[in-house]
């Protein structure tokens, strides 16, 4: 029995990155030998065991053979005669087909170290084309390592295009699509994930609402980048710089979906695109089974992001109504989230990346003023039932009006 550290732990150690999860491959052992050594079996489809002390995963070396459609259509063979090289060959990318033995020696039969040094994401073998989930995984790796200047090998991107054109991605479950997308959205450069999917044709298949934005123009005065799809990826990049929150990043991605519905004869203007985009956000989220809290924020951002941009001319009554509409009294975090998505929208434009966004500060300040109005005083003043809400709203409007006159006066007055 020989044990090797494999995959991501070896890759990240060679890149000088923190190693999070460790996976191990066991060569020359049977399931019974693992159980006798105190390991606990957890794998149903193939033999995976938990170490009795560390609880890290130890898998028996195995090979896979395509036996059906999609990413689940594989037959696994695990036995003591399966070599380490055979196990590594079934992996997706050469940089993930690395192993390290007990002496610290790197086993690299598929030239993963060379590709690490060249900053290349390259598939190990033609078997890559048998698993459509790998298209999304490579896109996610491209996003994860974009800051290290990794790129996808030409032949790998060509294979991803072939897989997409052959309809392989249609076998993916929506849950798996969302899981990969969720992970990609938390990387340093989530926009790269969507750009890669577009480059291989997968964006049109998996995210038609986003793909439809490419080629849709916006007024050059406000959007020097012109193309709405390009702007969307720029805003996502900016959102990733502004916030680590998945909610903020996903909502930013969806903020302009309504522009894909604008009739061509009305281009480049997109009047009413915010409210129009809400149903597309709903559609995308329902299909991918996006969690409700992410969906709800994305719908609010789609509907109200343009309103935030006009903050100086908003009436105090409108500002308080906005807080009502986003349910800020029960979910105060939404004020900060919407301020960040709106800032990402403005700064996610060519030449505006370093712009100040005072509207975000004003929104936060107005919220502090409005929520500081004490409910207790309204109740103690004798108001009852629905009168409490009405009086509270009046006082909030008055407080915001007083603040706004000093801090953010209407330029038209």
Swiss-Prot record:
One of its GO terms (molecular function) is tRNA binding. Magnesium is required for nucleotidyltransferase activity. Nickel for phosphatase activity. ATP binds at residues 8, 11, 91, 137, 140. Its EC number is 2.7.7.72, 3.1.3.-, 3.1.4.-. One of its GO terms (biological process) is tRNA 3'-terminal CCA addition. CDD domains: HDc, NT_ClassII-CCAase. Gene3D superfamilies: Beta Polymerase, domain 2 (3.30.460.10), cca-adding enzyme, domain 2 (1.10.3090.10). It catalyses: a tRNA precursor + 2 CTP + ATP = a tRNA with a 3' CCA end + 3 diphosphate; a tRNA with a 3' CCA end + 2 CTP + ATP = a tRNA with a 3' CCACCA end + 3 diphosphate. Residues 228-329 form the HD domain. Mg(2+) binds at residues 21, 23. NCBIfam families: PRK10885.1. HAMAP family: CCA_bact_type1 (MF_01261), CCA_bact_type2 (MF_01262). This is Multifunctional CCA protein. It comes from Salmonella paratyphi B (strain ATCC BAA-1250 / SPB7). The gene is cca.
């Amino acid at each position: 029995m020989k044990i090797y550290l494999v995959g991501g732990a070896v890759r990240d150690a060679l890149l000088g990155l923190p190693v999070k999860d460790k996976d191990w491959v066991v060569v020359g052992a049977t399931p019974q030998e693992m159980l006798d050594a105190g390991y606990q079996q957890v794998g149903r489809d193939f033999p995976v065991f938990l170490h009795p002390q560390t609880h890290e995963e130890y898998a028996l070396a195995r090979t896979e053979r395509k036996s059906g459609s999609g990413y689940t259509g594989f037959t696994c063979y695990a036995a003591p005669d399966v070599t380490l090289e055979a196990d590594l060959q079934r992996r997706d990318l050469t940089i993930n087909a690395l192993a390290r033995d007990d002496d610290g020696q790197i086993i690299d039969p598929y030239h993963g170290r060379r590709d690490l040094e060249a900053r290349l994401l390259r598939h190990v073998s033609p078997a890559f084309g048998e698993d459509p989930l790998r298209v999304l995984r490579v896109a996610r790796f491209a996003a994860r390592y974009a800051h290290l200047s990794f790129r996808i090998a030409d032949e790998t991107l060509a294979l991803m295009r072939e897989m997409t054109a052959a309809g392989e991605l249609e076998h993916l479950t929506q849950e798996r699509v969302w899981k990969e997308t969720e992970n990609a959205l938390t990387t340093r450069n989530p926009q790269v994930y969507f750009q890669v999917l577009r480059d291989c044709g997968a964006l049109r298949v998996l995210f038609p609402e986003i793909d439809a934005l490419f080629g849709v123009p916006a007024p050059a005065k406000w959007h020097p980048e012109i193309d709405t799809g390009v702007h969307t990826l720029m805003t996502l990049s900016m959102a990733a710089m502004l916030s680590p929150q998945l909610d903020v990043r996903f909502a930013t991605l969806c903020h302009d979906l309504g522009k894909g519905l604008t009739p061509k004869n009305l281009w480049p203007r997109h009047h009413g695109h915010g409210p129009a985009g809400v149903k597309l956000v709903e559609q995308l989220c329902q299909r991918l089974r996006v969690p409700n809290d992410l969906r709800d924020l994305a719908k609010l951002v789609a509907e109200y992001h343009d309103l935030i941009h006009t903050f100086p001319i908003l009436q105090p009554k409108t500002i308080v109504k906005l807080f009502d509409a986003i349910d800020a009294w029960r979910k105060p975090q939404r004020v900060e989230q919407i301020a960040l998505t709106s800032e990402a929208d403005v700064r996610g434009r060519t030449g505006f990346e370093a712009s100040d966004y005072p509207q975000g500060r004003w929104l936060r300040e107005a919220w502090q003023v409005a929520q500081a109005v004490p409910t207790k005083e309204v109740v103690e003043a004798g108001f009852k039932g629905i009168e409490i809400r009405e009086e509270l709203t009046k006082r909030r409007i008055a407080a915001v009006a007083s603040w706004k006159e000093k801090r953010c006066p209407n330029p038209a007055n």
